[in-house]
């Protein structure tokens, strides 16, 4: 017979997990329910006790026989009904009723000490009648002075608790009287000598005296630290503590002096390497005294430098949040001055200590301040970042700043100051890593054959050579020499972040005020852009120009960027840039003719890239049209702009020799010159002449006159019509800067209009002209004779 099969199914693992979860939940609920019930009971008991105390304190005793009169309410009535139902009065004896009445009249349970809100059975020790104790003590009069007692710990006996006391030792009354008299005298002296109010002059003298003392103290601490930094590193803490100066008369000035002093000290005593924290193994090992002293100096320097930076950060935060300290030593207006000094110190440390600890923390503090509402602070931070970019040879510090700026611009959704992106123009990036072929990257290692080894070096020599190479490599690492590969890698990463920022703005914020800075940056670094992006970038630039939303300066930057791309690696691309030539030709007459002639410099750069460097791709007709329009433009701009434009015209006439037909007034061609047409290829510039040069020859600026005469002569390199070397050897952009009137100076200086004539002093009625002087003297010396005047003969002759 077969064994009976168990019909119960084995529970699955999921079901087991489910049940195991339910049990703890039920336990937790039960536990919480118990806690709640105990709390409810405790609160109910406390409520009853408090009510009993109130009833005991009240004047009218509340009889407990009539509970209905005590508290009217449905709840009390229900309780009374329940009690009556539970114990009917018919079933009780008369003696029991009398006993209950007596107990109700006494209410002895209310005489307990119920001031503390504790349960009734909370303490084992029973409370005694406190009132009876005080009543049993006999009353005494105040004639005899009571002795002061000191209460000690009580002793517990069979009978109960026995309190222990001790008399307080009595001091001599004479001494007390003397002390009291001395105190009274001191109080009288203080009252008699009130604080005199100082006048303004006395207050200023007192402040000057305090300030001089603080200055001397700061100078003494700073000189001690500079003389021996390792021994006096603890004095840095003392000097830094003066940043919390509490004297309201000199607090602001002293804090500013301490900030600047500490900044200069850190610049002087900081080592030229980064200090790393010691490991546990290094701390446990025994070292020499010199090494231990150096370690203590480094630890102290890093900690004080860290606290100093935190103090500067807190000052800037307090000013930004308009916070006042509780002490109110520094006013809210003075916080701005303190914040400016703190920011200036941070900028100095950013530039001076790019290799030291916490440099990234300084960058994080400085970058948001570049976009500050205060123009002075924003310019200060931007100038510091530019200075850092210019002097950073390796590129490590520049990369850190670029990362923070890129993230900040993206986080603010491109609503930042354009000056932040203009700092990118100061980056020292000239080379980047170019993607190599896989064959070049994975070149097999070439080993020397036996014959090559025997011919070149012996075994011992090769061994020595390897040792020398290893030693040189270690020396390079120790001296932190600049590695070309590392430099290229850092520059490539930096430029990638810059281009990502630029392309984001071109894509998402085309109407942003950042666009001119982006286009200017693209124009500078266009030769380093990857060839893969050229087509898309040129399409975007042309779209921006055609949209008409750009100013003439922004559109010039677009043209400049496009031709920088095409003049570099873009030579390989088959792109016709005719639309960019047309746009530049059209924009020339839109240049500002007043003091803000910034666009002229961009035009000179564009002409150099578009016409001079691409001479083989430029037709003669296009060159003639540009020369004619440039000469017309030179008539209505400032002198330095005219000099730069005429210098560019001279270069174009040398680059395209056949353009000299514009100097010949008798030459003829087909068609009529159309000066207002915006197409340089079809304006028939060969049928005109450069008459503007004759007007420029009479210009008030002597250099403009020389250039005009030189171009009329055909721009010769030698002979009487040639220019001086200081003019011919300089580029158009250099001449534009050299003869600028931005500093309100005239180059060359203007000659005096009234020259002084030396050696001749006029005396009396003498004249400069000697003949006139002799004639006057002769007629004045002759004797005057009267002769009749007859004009009729002259009239007769004239009538005939």
From Swiss-Prot:
Subcellular location: Nucleus, Nucleolus; Nucleus speckle
Sections of the chain in a coiled coil: 451-490
Compositional bias segments (type: Basic and acidic residues): 66-78, 160-174
Protein's GO biological process: DNA replication initiation
Domain of life from the UniProt record: Eukaryota
Residue numbers spanned by region Disordered: 1-93, 160-187
Molecular function (Gene Ontology), one example: chromatin binding
Stretches with biased composition (Basic residues): 40-51
Pfam families per UniProt: CBF, NOC3p
Keyword Ubl conjugation: yes
Keywords for the protein's UniProt record, in alphabetical order: Coiled coil, Isopeptide bond, Nucleus, Phosphoprotein, Ubl conjugation
Composition bias type Acidic residues, residue spans: 79-93, 175-187
InterPro entries assigned: ARM-type_fold, CCAAT-binding_factor, Noc3_N, Nucleolar_cplx-assoc_3
Modified residues (Phosphoserine): 787
Cross-link (Glycyl lysine isopeptide (Lys-Gly) (interchain with G-Cter in SUMO2)): 333
Cellular component terms (Gene Ontology): nuclear speck; nucleolus
UniProt function note: May be required for adipogenesis.
Recorded family membership: Belongs to the CBF/MAK21 family.
This protein's name: Nucleolar complex protein 3 homolog
Phylogenetic classification of the source organism: Eukaryota, Metazoa, Chordata, Craniata, Vertebrata
